[in-house]
Amino acid sequence: MLKAPFLPIRDLVIFPNVVTPIYVGRANSIATLEKAIANKTKLVLGLQKDASQENPTFDGDIYEVGVIANIVQIIRMPNNNIKVLVEAEDRVKIKNIEKEENEYVTTYTVIKETLKDSKETEAIYRKVFTRFEKYVSMIGKFSSELILNLKKIEDYSNGLDIMASNLNISSEKKQEILEISNVRDRGYRILDEIVAEMEIASLEKTIDDKVKNKMNEAQRAYYLKEKISVMKEELGDFSQDDDVIEIVDRLKNTELPKEVREKLEAEVKKLTKMQPFSAESSVIRNYIEAVLELPWNSETNDVLDLKKASQILERDHYGLKDAKEKVLDYLAVKKLNPSMNGVILCLSGPPGIGKTSLVKSIAESMGRKFVRVSLGGVRDEAEIRGHRRTYVGSMPGKIMKAMKEAGTNNPVMLLDEIDKMSNDFKGDPASAMLEVLDPEQNKNFEDHYIDMPFDLSKVFFVATANDLRNVSAPLRDRMDILQLSSYTEFEKLHIAQKFLLKQAQKENGLANIDIKIPDKVMFKLIDEYTREAGVRNLKREIITICRKLAREVVEKDTKKFNLKPTDLEKYLGKAKFRPEKSRKATGKIGVVNGLAWTAVGGVTLDVQGVDTPGKGEVTLTGTLGNVMKESASVAMTYVKANLKKYPPKDKDFFKDRTIHLHFPEGATPKDGPSAGITITTAIVSVLTNKKVRQDIAMTGEITITGDVLAIGGVREKVIGAHRAGIKEVILPEDNRVDTDEIPDELKSTMKIHFAKTYDDVSKLVFVK
């Protein structure tokens, strides 16, 4: 004997392997169901003989054969009733029903079926299926999927039960079919019922046709309305489920533009006519919720206190003067002109210099919400604009998601790594960003999913990039670009002592511990353990030191630390870089120090040249771009045109020899015209056998007439030279105005020369 909760059912017979909805409203039945749900147990379901009996006594009031069923889903109705989807497993014989407190419990045995797979059973099943198919066609109330699913069923018992459950016959007749355990006999009984129902259906159709022909349009409309009303009443009125009621309340209480409200009201109207379990209902519900969650009219008030804003920016960041000035300028204009639209900035510079954290400080200084949109690796336009609702699993794009997250229509929005977007067959996300960042268009930005204009003109957009060359020209044109440069060692020292060390102490529970890292120790840490444009690795190393110190605090109860240079190896291991020493003026033939500007800051660009047997050509290696190759051709032409100034060591040099120029780190692509004078110097050195000073570096574009033209990234390149231990640099005369950007501490330790022509360069670079 088995035991399970028992639920009496009225006017409904449930067959095995059929998912059936039932409505539970009686107090004892609800208590029984709640216990089964809580204990995750199965239910025994049995039909009441008298449906009008509110409280059955179980003394002959319940049929002896029922089913054991699993609970598939529950829906709590507004009237406190519960709608339950159950799936029956087997026929059971109900033995004894008892009432324990407020719940029904029964003992039962599972009924075994007979003649399940005999030839006669197969024959009667085919006959029943053929008749049932005609019955379905005649009635016209069943979906085509019912017949398709029956064709796939190989278990005759299951198929017969499904057909019986769909017959329009009384509960008593269905109960009689349920009680037949002999599958063959059950088939005969169902066949009899189908034949009888087809005869009745045929007569009803004849009568309906006669009646409908006599009905006028008004009567017909009344008939349909009454029929729909009765159906809704029987089904529990789907339009009033909790989710729909909540959505309607939110729509009433949310301030929305007129056109948005009208569209949502139309969508809600559709939703109320749908069953809550339909796929389309879920799509519409998700859409309405997505639109309601957008900040259509929610706006934060700007804090237009320039003094306070300046204090916040200075508190969190050292340097970055231009970016801070730009924000304060904007706040001043906003104070004078409150109707001013948002700003679109782009902070470009090496990684780790504080671009992202600066944007957070901008948001705080303005009193606005901060939200971040990561664009690195985005290749699909739909990630920006969203997917149209016709697609399965569609959703809003990153911009609308960010606006939802912000909760206001004027946040500070960080568009992180805008240079890392790429395109493929799905579209170009950079083109989609044009509408987002165009002040003339973003007032009516239309996400494909939302499908209504949304005003982005109040958003303060700040994009970040490492290399603007990877950003399309139209996109660059829409942004106010601020070029942020690398930090010098002195700036890194200040940042480390004022910000990074304190932050690392706080993060590692050392805020109350006295930790001192003297400047000379910090310089050693910067020079020998980190080589970067920013301070990201420096922060990481300081955190590592703090973790080691935290361990000493726990193990030895140390309260004070004063680090020495030798302690760095103890906490961080061997130095990762050799300390740069001032390069000597001794020269090498064909080896020249150039300067380059990369996405991670300024670096030295070495050029190595030798002559080999050949026919006066220049061979270039080192993964060079077309512009750099052309610079080499220009340099060679200039040298050949000025052989009187730079006489070759061999008069037949260009007949018998070839110059090979190599740029080390061959796996790294190199391009640009700024290595022109560097290449020229290498060619002249090899040609004349003159040694080139190794304590000097240079940058500048060369022309075939020997003029030295201006280049970009002066500050970065000078910092890179200083980092490499070089004390003298040669810059184009036209870049003299750019030296104001070079930190004063570098100017005081380095000698900067300016050249109008290559003659000025040649006077400085060769060992005399």
UniProtKB/Swiss-Prot annotation:
Keywords: ATP-binding, Cytoplasm, Hydrolase, Nucleotide-binding, Protease, Serine protease, Stress response. It comes from the Bacteria. Transmembrane segments: none annotated. GO terms for cellular component: cytoplasm. GO terms for molecular function: ATP binding; ATP hydrolysis activity; ATP-dependent peptidase activity; sequence-specific DNA binding; serine-type endopeptidase activity. The active site is at residues 674, 717. Its EC number is 3.4.21.53. It is an enzyme of class 3 (hydrolase). Induction: By heat shock. One of its GO terms (biological process) is cellular response to heat. ATP binds at residues 349-356. Residues 586-768 form the Lon proteolytic domain. It catalyses: Hydrolysis of proteins in presence of ATP. PROSITE patterns: LON_N (PS51787), LON_PROTEOLYTIC (PS51786), LON_SER (PS01046). It is found in: Cytoplasm. SUPFAM superfamilies: P-loop containing nucleoside triphosphate hydrolases (SSF52540), PUA domain-like (SSF88697), Ribosomal protein S5 domain 2-like (SSF54211). Pfam families: AAA, Lon_C, Lon_lid, LON_substr_bdg. HAMAP family: lon_bact. Homohexamer. Organized in a ring with a central cavity. ATP-dependent serine protease that mediates the selective degradation of mutant and abnormal proteins as well as certain short-lived regulatory proteins. Required for cellular homeostasis and for survival from DNA damage and developmental changes induced by stress. Degrades polypeptides processively to yield small peptide fragments that are 5 to 10 amino acids long. Binds to DNA in a double-stranded, site-specific manner. Belongs to the peptidase S16 family. PANTHER family: ATP DEPENDENT LON PROTEASE FAMILY MEMBER. This is Lon protease. It comes from Fusobacterium nucleatum subsp. nucleatum (strain ATCC 25586 / DSM 15643 / BCRC 10681 / CIP 101130 / JCM 8532 / KCTC 2640 / LMG 13131 / VPI 4355). The lineage of its organism: Bacteria, Fusobacteriati, Fusobacteriota, Fusobacteriia, Fusobacteriales.
